[in-house]
Swiss-Prot record:
Its main location: membrane. NCBIfam families: kdpA. Keywords: Cell inner membrane, Cell membrane, Ion transport, Membrane, Potassium, Potassium transport, Transmembrane, Transmembrane helix, Transport. The chain crosses the membrane at residues 9-29, 63-83, 135-155, 177-197, 285-305, 312-332, 412-432, 451-471, 516-536, 560-580. It comes from Methylococcus capsulatus (strain ATCC 33009 / NCIMB 11132 / Bath). This is Potassium-transporting ATPase potassium-binding subunit. Part of the high-affinity ATP-driven potassium transport (or Kdp) system, which catalyzes the hydrolysis of ATP coupled with the electrogenic transport of potassium into the cytoplasm. This subunit binds the periplasmic potassium ions and delivers the ions to the membrane domain of KdpB through an intramembrane tunnel. GO terms for cellular component: plasma membrane. The keyword Metal-binding does not apply. GO terms for molecular function: P-type potassium transmembrane transporter activity; potassium ion binding. Belongs to the KdpA family. It is found in: Cell inner membrane. The system is composed of three essential subunits: KdpA, KdpB and KdpC. It is a multi-pass membrane protein.
Length: 595
C-alpha cells in the first residue's frame, strides 16, 4: 500500500472518530429533550403532533411501541407501491415514464421501507422525479428514523427501572427526522451541489458528442430474432452515435439522506459511480463519511444516555477493531490485482481497476465498499461484482456478520447490543453466575429474543440461496457460470437478508422470482429483528437495577472488547464460511491455478 493510500484511510478514520463525540452528545440531548434545537423547534414539534393527533406525553409499552413501528412501516410500503403503480398519471414525470411492473414495485416498496434500498431497476430509466422524491426520499428519512427510534427504546430499557413503558414511538421518530436527519441532510446536500451533484426538475437533455462513436449490433428480423448468414454467424450492422442523453433530476437531496440514513439507493442506476451523483474526490469523501458518521456517533449517544460513556466507547472500539483489518484486506487484494494474472506471469502493476472509476482509484473504491457493507448502506462507487474473489468476499462477509460493524443508523447498534448481551451470557456461563449487563440481569427470556435476532438473517440468506440454486427461476438469472455465479446469488441474499442493498450486479435480479424472494427476505430480516429487540427492551425496563459486585463482568474494559469481537466473528464464521467456501474462496483458488 502506498503512503498516499494509507494517508487517505487514516484521514477518513480520523475525521469519522473525531465526529463521534460531538454528534453523539447532540443526539443524546435531542432524545432526552435537552438540546437547544428541541427548545427552538418546540412549536414545530407541537404543530406536527397536533395535526397528526399525537399525544407526546403518552408513554408506550413495548407492544404498543412495536405496533406503531410496524403499522407505520406497512403504510410506507403501501404508499410507495401505489406511487410506483400510478406514476404514469402523476405530475413531475418529464420523461413520461410508465407505471412500474407489479413485482418490481413490490420489491422496491419493501426495499425502501426496510432501509435496505435494494434496486433491481435502473433509477433514471424507471422512476419519475415525483416517485424518487415523494416515495423513495421520504422513505429514506422515515426508515432511518424508525431504526433510530427502536435503538432509543432499547437504551431506555437499560436505563429505566421497574418501568413498563419505553417512551413514545411518534416522538422519537419526529425528533430523529426534525432535529438530526433533516439538518444534516440539508447541509450535506448544499455541499454536494457545490461539488456539482445535480439538483433540478428539468427533463433529460440530449447533447451532441464532440466526436461521434460507432459500434456493430446484431440485426434482427421482424419477429425480433437475430439474423445469421449461411455459415451461422450473426449478421451485424454498423451504428453511429452522435448524441447522448444526459439524465437529470433532484439527485443531491436524495443522495444526502441515502448516505446519512444508511439507505444507499441511488438516484442513478450506477449509484455513486455516476458523475452526476458523485463528481469529485471531495464529494466522494463527504459521501463516504456520511455512511458511517451517525452509526459511529450513536455509540457515544448510547454511553451518554446510560450514564457511562465508557460503554459507548467500548462498542465503538469493537466495531472499529473489526472494520479496520477487513478494510486493509480489501485494499491489498484489489491492489494485488487478479490472481490469475500472477499465475500466468503477468504483472498487474495497476492493481484490479476493473469496475472502478479512475477519479477515485483503488483505495477509495475499496474503502467505500468496506464502509457501505459494514453499515447497512449498500451504495457503491465501484462495481463489487468486478472485485477480486477475496476483495469481494470481505464486503459479503461484513453483511453476513449481521450489519453490526457500525451497521445501519439505529439498527447497527441495537444489533451489536444484542451481541453484547450474548457475550455477557457466555461469560456468565464460564464463571457460573447469572450474567448482568449495565445493571440488568440477562435471563432466559432475553436470550431467547437474542437468539431470534441472531438466527433470522442467516435463515433468510442461506435458505434463500438454497432455494435459488435449486430452482430454474433462480438459476436462469445467472450469466456467470461456476463459483462466481453462486457468489452472485449468495451476495444478493446476504444483502437483502441483512438490509444492505448492494449487489454483485451480474445477477439479473429484476425478475418475478428474485423480486418476490428478496422482498420477503428484506421484510422478515427487518421486522423479525426489530420486534424481538423491543421485547428485550420491555423486559429490561421492568427489571430493577443490580449493583455491580465482585463477580460482575466489567463491560468497559479492553477484555470485553475482545470478547465482543470474538462472539461476533465466531458466529459469523461458523454460519457462513461453508457457503463462502463454495463461492469466493474456491473462485480464488481456481484463479491461482489459472483455470
Amino acid at each position: 500500500m502506498t503512503a498516499n493510500g494509507l494517508l487517505q484511510i487514516c484521514g477518513y478514520l480520523g475525521v469519522l472518530l473525531a465526529l463521534a463525540k460531538p454528534l453523539g452528545s447532540y443526539m443524546a440531548a435531542v432524545y432526552e429533550g435537552r438540546s437547544a434545537t428541541v427548545r427552538v423547534l418546540a412549536s414545530v414539534e407541537r404543530f406536527i403532533y397536533r395535526i397528526t393527533g399525537i399525544d407526546p406525553e403518552a408513554e408506550m409499552r413495548w407492544t404498543g411501541y412495536a405496533s406503531a413501528f410496524l403499522v407505520f412501516n406497512l403504510l410506507g410500503v403501501l404508499a410507495v407501491y401505489a406511487l410506483q403503480r400510478c406514476q404514469g398519471f402523476l405530475p413531475l414525470n418529464p420523461q413520461g415514464l410508465p407505471a412500474v411492473a407489479p413485482d418490481s414495485a413490490f420489491n422496491t416498496a419493501i426495499s425502501f421501507a426496510t432501509n435496505t434500498n435494494w434496486q433491481g431497476y435502473g433509477g433514471e430509466m424507471t422512476l419519475s422525479h415525483l416517485t424518487q422524491m415523494l416515495g423513495l426520499t421520504v422513505q429514506n428519512f422515515v426508515s432511518a428514523a424508525s431504526g433510530m427510534a427502536v435503538l432509543v427504546a432499547l437504551i431506555r430499557g437499560f436505563v429505566r427501572r421497574n418501568a413498563d413503558t419505553l417512551g413514545n414511538f411518534w416522538v422519537d421518530l419526529t425528533r430523529s427526522i426534525l432535529h438530526i436527519l433533516l439538518p444534516l441532510s440539508f447541509l450535506l446536500a448544499l455541499l454536494l451541489i457545490g461539488q456539482g451533484v445535480v439538483q433540478t426538475f428539468e427533463p433529460y437533455r440530449n447533447v451532441t458528442l464532440v466526436e461521434a462513436t460507432g459500434y456493430d449490433r446484431p440485426k434482427q428480423d421482424e419477429g425480433g430474432h437475430p439474423l445469421v448468414d449461411a455459415d451461422g454467424n450473426p449478421v451485424t450492422e454498423h451504428v453511429t452515435v452522435s448524441e447522448q442523453t444526459l439524465a437529470l433530476g433532484p439527485a443531491a437531496s436524495q443522495v444526502a439522506i441515502k448516505q446519512l440514513g444508511t439507505n444507499g439507493g441511488g438516484f442513478f442506476s450506477v449509484n455513486s459511480a455516476h458523475p452526476f451523483e458523485n463528481p469529485t474526490p471531495f464529494s466522494n469523501f463527504l459521501e463516504m463519511l456520511a455512511i458511517l458518521v451517525i452509526s459511529g456517533a450513536l455509540c457515544h449517544t448510547f454511553g451518554v444516555m446510560v450514564g457511562d460513556t465508557r460503554q459507548g466507547w467500548v462498542i465503538l472500539a469493537a466495531m472499529t477493531l473489526i472494520f479496520v483489518p477487513l478494510l486493509f484486506v480489501t485494499v491489498l487484494c484489489e491492489q494485488g490485482g487478479n490472481p490469475a494474472f500472477a499465475a500466468l506471469g503477468v504483472d498487474p502493476a495497476g492493481g484490479n481497476m476493473e469496475g472502478k472509476e479512475t477519479r477515485f482509484g483503488i483505495v477509495n473504491s475499496a474503502l467505500w465498499a468496506t464502509a457501505t457493507t459494514a453499515a447497512s448502506n449498500g451504495s457503491v462507487n465501484a462495481m463489487h461484482d468486478s472485485f477480486t474473489p477475496l476483495g469481494g468476499l470481505v464486503p459479503m462477509w461484513l453483511m453476513q456478520l449481521g450489519e453490526v460493524v457500525f451497521g445501519g443508523v439505529g439498527s447497527g447498534l441495537y444489533g451489536m447490543l444484542v451481541f453484547a448481551i450474548v457475550a455477557v451470557f457466555v461469560a456468565g456461563l464460564m464463571i457460573g453466575r447469572t450474567p448482568e449487563y449495565l445493571g440488568k440481569k440477562i435471563e432466559a427470556y432475553e436470550m431467547k429474543m437474542a437468539a431470534i435476532v441472531i438466527l433470522v438473517p442467516p435463515l433468510m440468506v442461506l435458505g434463500g440461496t438454497a432455494v435459488a440454486v435449486m430452482l430454474d427461476a433462480g438459476k436462469s438469472s445467472v450469466f456467470n457460470p461456476g463459483a462466481h455465479g453462486f457468489s452472485e446469488i449468495l451476495y444478493a441474499f446476504s444483502s437483502a437478508g441483512n438490509n444492505n442493498g448492494s449487489a454483485f450486479a451480474g445477477l439479473a435480479a429484476n425478475t418475478p422470482f428474485y423480486n418476490l424472494m428478496l422482498g420477503l427476505a428484506m421484510w422478515f430480516s427487518r421486522y423479525w429483528l426489530a420486534v424481538p429487540v423491543l421485547a428485550i427492551a420491555g423486559a429490561l425496563a421492568a427489571k430493577n437495577y443490580v449493583p455491580p459486585g465482585a463477580g460482575t463482568l466489567p463491560t468497559h474494559t479492553p477484555m470485553f472488547v475482545g470478547l465482543l469481537v470474538g462472539v461476533v466473528i465466531i458466529v459469523g464464521a461458523l454460519t457462513f464460511i461453508p457457503a463462502l467456501a463454495l463461492g469466493p474462496i474456491v473462485e480464488h483458488l481456481m484463479m491461482i491455478g489459472a483455470r
